Amino acid sequence: MKGSGRRRMNRELRAKDTWYPRLIKDLEKMNQRAETGKIVVRGKDTPWMQNRNAKVRYYFMPYKTDTALQTMQAFEHVIHRHSGKHRHQGGLAIFVLEGEGYTVVDGKHHDWKAGDLILLPIMPGGVSHQHFNANPKKPARWLALITNAYRAHLGYEIVQIEDSPDWKGSWEKSVRTGR
């Protein structure tokens, strides 16, 4: 290697690598969260909120930094009449805890009852869906699980098409306050 090429290589070797130390620090944070985060998330410690889709309680998700797991989300919905309607890339598993009803997925009607598992497939362009409670005297209740691992690769987005009839708030306010 000639002199100028060797000098350039030496300069490059002396350049400060800021990415690797950042990666190490982020991995340390993730490991610490896994070691010290909550293993049991208690329902009584998890508040109910009304959002554009339903009455919801978030057990864990990326924004909740006190849990041991950060690769998934788990949330419970209570649906009195029907949920809001929205579209996202799918990849959601919903276990029906109580009640009965149906879900419309891309225009197709699918009945369900307590003990059933609803699967929203991963689809290019997303999956439009809305959940309906069949019993006006008793709300339906279910637990949803979704993995975060693929989101960045799918260009994940959520498009709200219709709000729940129980939503009376301001979307902008709920984003600012988390309520």
Regions found by a protein language model. Give the residues of each.
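Conserved short histidine dyad/triad with adjacent acidic residue
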Residues: 57, 72-88, 121-126
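A short hydrophobic beta-strand segment most commonly corresponding to one strand
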Residues: 119-120, 129, 135-156
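Intrinsically disordered, low-complexity regulatory regions enriched in Ser/Pro/Gly/Thr
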Residues: 69, 87, 95-97, 111-112, ...
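Hydrophobic/aromatic beta-strand elements that line small-molecule binding cavities or substrate pockets
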Residues: 73, 116, 129-131
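Short, conserved beta-strand element in jelly-roll/cupin
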Residues: 74-79, 87-103, 145-147
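A short, N-terminal "cap"/entry segment at the start of jelly-roll beta-barrel domains
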Residues: 1-69, 155-179
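Short acidic-glycine-tyrosine-enriched beta hairpin
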Residues: 107-126
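Short histidine-centered beta-strand/loop micro-motifs
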Residues: 63-64, 82-88, 111, 130-133
